[in-house]
Amino acid sequence: MPNGTPTLNRPLARLALRITSCAHQGLERLIRLLHLLLHLGRSLLDLFQTLRTALTQPSTSIFSLTRLPLLLPPLRLLLLLLLPSPPRQPALASRLTQPNRPNRGRLAK
C-alpha cells in the first residue's frame, strides 16, 4: 500500500465499474423516459387546444391544412406508445457474466 491508501483488488474494481455503468445506463433511460413524457404532455396539450379551437370556431375545420400539422406530432407519439416496442438487447452485465459467448471486442477479457 503506497502512501497508506488501500487498493481494491481487480474483481472488486470490475464489479464496482459494472454497478456504476448499470446505474448510469438506468439514469440515462429514466431521463429519456421523462423527456418523452414531457413531449407527450406538450403534444397532448397542443392536440386538445387544437380540438377546442376547432369546436369553438365552426369556421375553421380540424382537417384544414393549417391545423393538420399541429395534430401530427401528438398522433405520432400516441402511436409510438401504443405499438409494441422492438425486442430489447440483453443487459451489459448478463453479457459480461456469460463465459461461453464469442469475442465481443472491448467486452472480451
Swiss-Prot record:
One of its GO terms (cellular component) is host cell cytoplasm. Residues 89-109 are annotated as: Disordered. It comes from the Viruses. Keywords: Host cytoplasm, Host-virus interaction, Phosphoprotein. The keyword Phosphoprotein applies. It is found in: Host cytoplasm. The keyword Iron-sulfur does not apply. This is Avian agnoprotein 2b. The lineage of its organism: Viruses, Monodnaviria, Shotokuvirae, Cossaviricota, Papovaviricetes.
